[in-house]
Amino acid sequence: MQIVEQMKDKALAELNLVKDKKTLDDIRVKYLGKKGELTEMMKLIATLPNDEKPKLGQAVNIAKQALQEAINLKLANFEEQELNEKLAQEKIDITLSGVGQNQGSLHPVTKTLNRIEAFFKQNGFAIEFGPEIESDYYNFETLNIPSHHPARAMHDTFYIDETHVLRTHTSGVQIRTMEKQQPPIRIIAPGRVYRCDSDITHTPMFHQVEGLLVDKDVSFADLKGLLHVFLNSFFEKDLKVRFRPSYFPFTEPSAEADIECVMCDGKGCRVCKHTGWLEVLGCGMVHPKVLKAGNIDSEKYQGFAFGMGVERLSMLRYGIDDLRMFFENDLRFLKQF
């Protein structure tokens, strides 16, 4: 039994000096393998007297158990050390700046359109839509635009055929609405429109919002009040607004609304051509002929209409000086919004 105890102490001492898993396994085989030293001790039991056999068997088993536990503990330490080394190599430095993610956003024209629609919906206006390929009848005739009017010229309008055009405004939606609805009518008609023009302030396709209100006892004062409130709301400031007499075949009287230049606060700059004013929309009282074309009794009802370019308002709101930037898909430009 003393030999077994010495063998155990020797094995444990060797374990304390082990530095790697291979050496650890060699010690395991040396003492606990099929031909290991402690295993061979079990073979001596057969040569002992009967009263000595249990003592030796018990001593060998205790030694083997102690050695196996020590080996298991050492092995666990090695595996933990390997895991820590691996984690250290694969460690992610969370203090570093992350990789930026591309984040989408709405196009500035869409933002402007949503802002316009939100205001008029809050003021009781419905949103109506119509075809972009419009008939000559709805695009011109019903709007009091005679055949000799310049707007019908080939250089101003995209003709599909002799009787159909790419709509030059969304006014046709107003006629279609009056045909199917009776007053009171409150609508806006947003959408794409097309004209033969392309430069720093014009594109062949652009977005427009037109509005129509038809009811009893409607006056130009109602129109002015609505548009004044809208412009102050859109630009989020108390603006000076003026209405200048103008001419549109579908309204009488007609006017154009100017606002105090939002770039220079009316002091005069390149954008407002040093006048201190910016033209933003056209408006007027609906011409009796247009009401008649929409099956509305002009003796009983009056109406006003207005129209504005969405890109124009976007340019003023966001300080953009070239209309073409809206359509170039330049991410450097679009990411600013």
Curated annotation (Swiss-Prot):
Its EC number is 6.1.1.20. GO terms for molecular function: ATP binding; magnesium ion binding; phenylalanine-tRNA ligase activity; tRNA binding. GO terms for cellular component: cytoplasm. Binds 2 magnesium ions per tetramer. The keyword NAD does not apply. It comes from the Bacteria. SUPFAM superfamilies: Class II aaRS and biotin synthetases, tRNA-binding arm. CDD domains: PheRS_alpha_core (cd00496). One of its GO terms (biological process) is phenylalanyl-tRNA aminoacylation. Mg(2+) binds at residue 252. Its main location: cytoplasm. Transmembrane segments: none annotated. Its cofactor is Mg(2+). The keyword Nucleotide-binding applies. Coiled coil: none annotated. InterPro entries: aa-tRNA-synth_II, aa-tRNA-synth_II/BPL/LPL, Phe-tRNA-synth_IIc_asu, Phe-tRNA_ligase_II_N, Phe_tRNA_ligase_alpha1_bac, Phenylalanyl-tRNA_Synthase, tRNA-bd_arm. It is found in: Cytoplasm. Belongs to the class-II aminoacyl-tRNA synthetase family. Phe-tRNA synthetase alpha subunit type 1 subfamily. PANTHER family: PHENYLALANINE--TRNA LIGASE, MITOCHONDRIAL, PHENYLALANYL-TRNA SYNTHETASE. This is Phenylalanine--tRNA ligase alpha subunit. The gene is pheS.
